[in-house]
Amino acid sequence: MLLVIDIGNSNIVLGLYEGDELQHHWRVSTDRNKTEDEYGMLVKSLFGSVGLGFEQVRGVIISSVVPPLNLTIERMCGKYMQQKALIIGPGIKTGLNIKYEYPREVGSDRIVNAVAAIHHYGAPLIVVDFGTATTFCYVDERAQYWGGAIAPGIGISTEALFTRAAKLPRIEITKPASVVGRNTIAAMQAGIFYGFVGQVEGIVRRIMDEYGTQPTVVATGGLASLFANETSCIHVVDQNLTLKGLRLIYERNQS
């Protein structure tokens, strides 16, 4: 089986593929202080929960936006699975034509998402990833990656609001009954929810206007479904987009 690992700022997502089928996937909190052994025991318990062992892993590929964890996870794969992990970075074949001014600056998660979106949904397209940061990536009709926009994520924004405004309580991020909140909690929910809906609609519209295309808009990330249900500008929600992209890139590097 192929183990795909997406190391994000808030969560690490692991998936197990048999061929092109995602058999299992898990999400755990990112902890920069854990050792290779601690991660090894954690992953062993996840595998064990579905009756699998490390010996069934035949390949590993990693995407990471947390460089301090790269070596830890790489060593974990070597020590417990006897596998040398493929890590997304310079020298890896992605098949993506990157037009970014400084290609090495593009986050590996953005590259992986674009590869998966092109393969499954075609170009042109915009990928919106609701992660620790909310990112927008534009790929033109020739499948060329041009870049996009990076904004503070929902979690970062709401945490700043809770921290800096002493009288405002912590609330659940959910769709409110009305855009006009008639109490503090409802007003906060309206501002957060419709503020992010407006952000997505505004940036997507400006990209479309600037490039003169009608791209497919693909959303991914934990809260993608919540916001996609409120706006017609998002056409597809794919929560496993990054895992799919990792599998595709792994295959492209086996020849």
Swiss-Prot record:
Per UniProt, substrate binds at: Y100, G107, S108, D109, R110, T184
Which CDD domains does the annotation name? ASKHA_NBD_PanK-III
The record places the active site at D109
* Molecular function terms from GO: ATP binding; metal ion binding; pantothenate kinase activity
Q: Where in the cell is it found?
A: Cytoplasm
Q: Where does ATP bind?
A: D6, I7, G8, N9, S10, N11, I12, V13, T132
Its cofactor is: NH4(+); K(+)
Keywords, alphabetical: ATP-binding, Coenzyme A biosynthesis, Cytoplasm, Kinase, Metal-binding, Nucleotide-binding, Potassium, Transferase
Q: Which reaction does it catalyse?
A: (R)-pantothenate + ATP = (R)-4'-phosphopantothenate + ADP + H(+)
One protein family per Pfam: Pan_kinase
Q: Give the record's GO CC terms.
A: cytoplasm
Q: Which residues bind K(+)?
A: D129
Tell me the GO BP annotations in alphabetical order. coenzyme A biosynthetic process
The pathway noted for it is: Cofactor biosynthesis; coenzyme A biosynthesis; CoA from (R)-pantothenate: step 1/5
Cofactor remark from the record: A monovalent cation. Ammonium or potassium.
The answer to keyword Coiled coil applying to this record is no
Q: What superkingdom does the record give?
A: Bacteria
EC numbers on record: 2.7.1.33
Which family, according to UniProt? Belongs to the type III pantothenate kinase family.
The cross-references to HAMAP family, in alphabetical order and at most eight, read: Pantothen_kinase_3 (MF_01274)
Q: Which PANTHER family match?
A: TYPE III PANTOTHENATE KINASE
Record's subunit section: Homodimer.
The UniProt function text for this chain reads: Catalyzes the phosphorylation of pantothenate (Pan), the first step in CoA biosynthesis.
Instruction: Provide the protein name.
Output: Type III pantothenate kinase
What species is given as this protein's source?
Brevibacillus brevis (strain 47 / JCM 6285 / NBRC 100599)
